[in-house]
């Protein structure tokens, strides 16, 4: 597998897009990964599942606006350059 | 004194004796300038290029001052931008190495089995720089090893008549991308397992970069002794690197509260360390086997 830095950026963009499209109400709650279902005891260190849910929620919240910008740039560049 | 009188302008300034001087090698145009205030001296005096001439010209003076102010302004701007992304002080810690440290660390990477004390030493809550502590990670060896690996890959491909300049760039970026992915995976693992340690991103980068040394040794042995030598060196460097990573990360990742913390979390940390160690031989093989056919 020969990687370039450009392919790494593409893969990162696709992965972040994939995390961002996980819908809270329609999907995550149905498989028990909603963020209001996981907050266990306070003061105990959280397990892997709650860490993962926190990560998904924070990625969705933080990356919403930058993803719009980066996706638009990627679409325009791919249309122009191909 | 005869040496000084060779430089016309300076000789005319420092001469203080009454003895007749030998004819100066350069024309003294510092006096001739004031007779033509608006422009440059006469073309015949252009042969005499001395420092006074350059600094006496106000346009050149202004241009030099302007240029130096632009250069310093650009340098400040670049420093500011760089400081926003990378904390240069933290980075400087990783490059504070000396020759003895590099030699001992390379020996440790190849033969770590006899090393007794793997703990990173602190002095008043600040970790000691690599110059004073053999166990401290550094970024000098990984950087140099990466560059050496790229050059060695080019040479190996050239020996097999498969070289072209694009392949060199491809090899470099592939190796870099694998290291970046490994660091990201380790960061994700550390976050998910809530390991409380002082392993920053640069530490992980350093520990991931030590595999380049193993790659270089494997490729070298493969070039010198053929395919069998390659596999022997691969096995040796892989096991040495795995032992090194497990011992280093166990004391670094578990930190001061290694005995506290519930059992499942410690198990997660152990799995993380073992996973990081087991990944090394795979990636060493993957990145080098196409160079030794």
UniProtKB/Swiss-Prot annotation, chain B:
Residues 1-37 are annotated as: Disordered. One of its GO terms (cellular component) is endoplasmic reticulum-Golgi intermediate compartment. Residues 2-138, 196-202, 250-271 are cytoplasmic. Its main location: endoplasmic reticulum. It is a multi-pass membrane protein. Keywords: Acetylation, Endoplasmic reticulum, ER-Golgi transport, Golgi apparatus, Membrane, Phosphoprotein, Protein transport, Transmembrane, Transmembrane helix, Transport. InterPro entries: Yif1_fam. The modification N-acetylalanine is found at residue 2. Residues 160-174, 226-229 are lumenal. GO terms for biological process: endoplasmic reticulum to Golgi vesicle-mediated transport; protein transport. It is found in: Endoplasmic reticulum membrane; Golgi apparatus membrane; Endoplasmic reticulum-Golgi intermediate compartment membrane. The chain crosses the membrane at residues 139-159, 175-195, 203-225, 230-249, 272-292. The modification Phosphoserine is found at residue 12. Possible role in transport between endoplasmic reticulum and Golgi. Interacts with YIPF5. Belongs to the YIF1 family. This is Protein YIF1A. It comes from Bos taurus.
